[in-house]
């Protein structure tokens, strides 16, 4: 099955995508070598792009099996949720941020908190200036959820790397990753979302036909749109570290 544009893939294609994932990943004992071979030969199936980037960026451990991938991505998703809670949750500061003239400890805290809030709002403003101009010729990037995804990833990364902070062009790097990842992620109903233990159980099924029956569930685990922000964040983080 061929696609004229990666952004044209719809949820109806998921059976084809999960089948490709099964034949090239789940039923293959040399996953990394298989992906590298596709890359060298220039015939990488489009539906394997997110998987290949996760290997190249080190999100998936190199020369490992798919159970190692499950463990790795699960740990990263837990880690990213903690980052979101730390940097994106509404903070309730102690001390009066407006009363900064006093010498007592409470007012000093208020001054620090006021400065932090100002700096964070300024960082968001600067990032948003680029986001509203990012690939606006592509409908995907005019969606509010994509703009929010871009903002969250860039804001959290800059908070964790304040020695670098935000630089113009970072938005374009994340946008390219979105183009590579987003078309192959889908919104699944709660009953379609397996947990880590179920996925490992299905992967360990020895009988090929029986294993194939559950391949779509394994595919779902790696391509849940609710988790794409996490996957993109660590891909971007790896890209930045390789470039820095």
What is the role of each PLM region?
Residues 1-163, 174, 178-226, 233, ...:
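N-terminal transition regions in large eukaryotic proteins
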């Amino acid at each position: 099955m061929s696609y004229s544009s990666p952004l044209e893939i719809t949820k109806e294609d998921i059976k084809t995508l999960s089948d490709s994932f099964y034949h090239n990943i789940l039923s293959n004992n040399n996953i990394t070598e298989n992906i590298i071979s596709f890359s060298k030969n220039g015939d990488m199936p489009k539906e394997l792009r997110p998987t290949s980037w996760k290997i190249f960026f080190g999100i998936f451990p190199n020369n490992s099996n798919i159970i190692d991938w499950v463990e790795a991505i699960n740990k990263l998703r837990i880690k990213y949720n903690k980052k979101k809670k730390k940097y994106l949750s509404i903070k309730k500061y102690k001390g009066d941020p407006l009363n900064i003239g006093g010498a007592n400890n409470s007012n000093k805290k208020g001054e620090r908190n006021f400065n932090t809030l100002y700096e964070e709002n300024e960082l968001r403003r600067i990032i948003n200036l680029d986001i509203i101009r990012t690939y606006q010729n592509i409908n995907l990037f005019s969606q509010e959820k994509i703009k929010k995804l871009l903002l969250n990833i860039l804001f959290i990364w800059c908070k964790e790397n304040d020695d670098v902070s935000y630089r113009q062009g970072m938005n374009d790097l994340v946008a390219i990753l979105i183009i590579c990842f987003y078309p192959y992620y889908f919104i699944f109903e709660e009953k379609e979302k397996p947990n880590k233990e179920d996925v490992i159980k299905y992967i360990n099924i020895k009988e090929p036909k029986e294993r194939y029956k559950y391949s779509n569930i394994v595919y779902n685990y790696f391509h849940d749109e609710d988790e794409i922000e996490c996957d993109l964040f660590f891909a971007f983080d790896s890209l930045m570290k390789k470039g820095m």
